[in-house]
Regions:
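Short, basic, low-complexity termini and linkers enriched in Ser/Thr/Gly/Pro
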Residues: 252-270
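Short, solvent-exposed loop/linker segments at the N-terminal edge
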Residues: 272-278
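Beta-sheet-rich non-transmembrane sensory/scaffold domains
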Residues: 1-252
Length: 278
């Protein structure tokens, strides 16, 4: 949660993420309707860094440590939520966005049945450890978004491929598309991640690839002249549109732990998605 801790530190912190989805899409499974949300979060003017908050000493006895800039101090949080007893200090810390995507059962009152938790961030930590939580308009921006909504899950769509329902989630700041099997909503799992961004390029010069995926459209195989299912991704910052052909769906769950070495990058990503136009 800090851009000043000199490394990747994914863990449990005493904060509450407000989902505030930027995109949502509904689909059917098991006779119910489910809603998939990309939990980006978005502040206006009601936020400050936690280092400037007055924290309740009973709830946060270690406030002095938590509010260090290498801990939670740099993280932006809501200034209008969290003073539960209205005594002028904060009993809870509410941050914008959840850095995740969620699935809600709309046939049963909108109950939450799945949330990806920290997995989207952990995937990036393994796939792009030297560009973790980068901004979308500048390369060489390692961890510049750690204190402010992280990768920012922005876009989401779903599609059926060979009898399986697949969710495609786009990360606006980091870039990249996540594939999840959501056929059984409560037991959804990661399939793959691909990022067409070039971290060695120059964003302003237009040589950094796709930047800022803003929207994703799924085109079923029977509606595509090529006979293959594809997704179309609109990238806000680079102004590019890219088509990805779904080459193959893996059977295995490709969950990954947080890693910080180049040698731990995920493999076989391009087997499942293939870029064929921009």
């Amino acid at each position: 949660p800090s851009d000043r801790d000199s490394g990747i530190n994914i863990g449990n912190w005493p904060v509450l993420g407000m989902h505030m989805p930027d995109s949502a899409v509904a689909y059917g499974a098991n006779g119910n309707t489910y809603l998939v949300t990309a939990n980006e979060g978005d502040a206006r003017s009601e936020d400050e860094r936690i280092e400037d908050f007055v924290l309740d000493p009973t709830v946060f006895p270690n406030a002095a440590d938590l509010q260090q800039r290498s801990q939670l101090g740099r993280l932006g949080a809501s200034t209008i939520d969290g003073d539960i007893d209205s005594d002028g200090d904060f009993d809870e810390l509410h941050v914008y966005g959840a850095r995740s995507f969620s699935i809600w059962d709309m046939s049963n009152g909108g109950v939450l049945v799945y949330d990806s938790g920290s997995e989207l961030e952990r995937v990036v930590a393994g796939y792009d450890p030297f560009d973790f939580n980068s901004n979308n308009d500048e390369n060489d921006s390692f961890e510049s978004r750690s204190d402010n909504k992280g990768i920012e899950p922005e876009a989401v769509t779903v599609g059926e491929i060979n009898g399986r329902t697949i969710a495609f989630v786009g990360a606006e700041r980091q870039g990249g598309i996540y594939l999840y099997d959501v056929t059984d909503p409560a037991n959804s799992y990661l399939l793959s991640y691909i990022n067409n961004r070039d971290f060695s390029g120059n964003a302003e010069a237009g040589t950094a690839g796709d930047l800022g995926p803003e929207g994703i459209v799924f085109v079923p195989a029977d509606q595509n002249p090529t006979g293959s299912a594809i997704i179309l991704v609109a990238n806000e910052v680079s102004g590019s549109t890219t088509a990805y052909r779904i080459v193959e769906l893996p059977d295995q769950d490709l969950r990954t732990e947080s890693k910080e070495a180049e040698s731990t990058k995920l493999t076989a990503i391009s087997v499942y998605l293939e870029s064929y136009g921009a």
